[in-house]
Amino acid sequence: MACRIRIDRLLVERGLFESRAQAQTAIAAGRVTADEVVVAKPSQEIATDAVLRAEPAHPYVSRGGVKLAAALDHFRFDPRFDPCGRVCLDVGASTGGFSEVLLARGARRVYAVDVGRGQLHPSLRERAEIVSIEATDIRVLDPARLAERPDFIVVDTSFISLKLVLPPVFALARTPAHLLALIKPQFEAGRRRGKKGIVRDPLVHAAACDEIAAFVSSHGWRVAEIVPSSITGGDGNREFFIAADRS
């Protein structure tokens, strides 16, 4: 059995960082994974034979910003998926990685909705363009809390199927509207879920994506494309963006 040592020390021994201080900074930013799972703290003890990865530094308040920025770059030649000048709805906003990217890409306003409290990064709370709606499940959000109906929606939720999240989102959106939502197969797979919640089977990934695409289409939205997220989720699961619009 492999020995276990502190992750910050192991990162330096592997040559991934020059110092433990650098390693600790990267861990705090959520940029280090061990066996495909994001490392939570520098003192965490890891097997010496673990597969370690350190993502490049990013300028966002969370890894979510990396995901959405890459997705928007993928669709950079499709004006439907350009948030510039649009009223956006960020479902599952959390720290605000998606919201931050939307603002950077020119969004006029962002309604950041999350079931938690106090998660939105302080730098975003100060932005006049952001309306933070905390402690609110999107399924029971009163439309009156939105001064304008959104025409650009992004979704990053966990522990719930998109089949439960999207119908209320569709009801809130104006027409035309545009959607980028993260499909997380581990929350769509049901009994097909992989070991310890990690879904590795590409066939299960494909089935989950196909099911969500069919669901979105059945609600009158046109699916443009499904593309893999540029990075995995924090638990090591593969994720996929579904892009769709309603006109």
Predicted regions mapped to residue ranges:
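Conserved class I S-adenosyl-L-methionine
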Residues: 83-94
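Short, glycine-/aromatic-enriched active-site segment of Class I SAM-dependent methyltransferases
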Residues: 185-201
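A short glycine-rich, Lys/Arg-flanked "PGG" loop and its adjoining helix->strand segment in the class I
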Residues: 163-180
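Residues at the N-terminus of the alpha-helix immediately C-terminal to the conserved SAM/SAH-binding loop
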Residues: 94, 98-99, 116
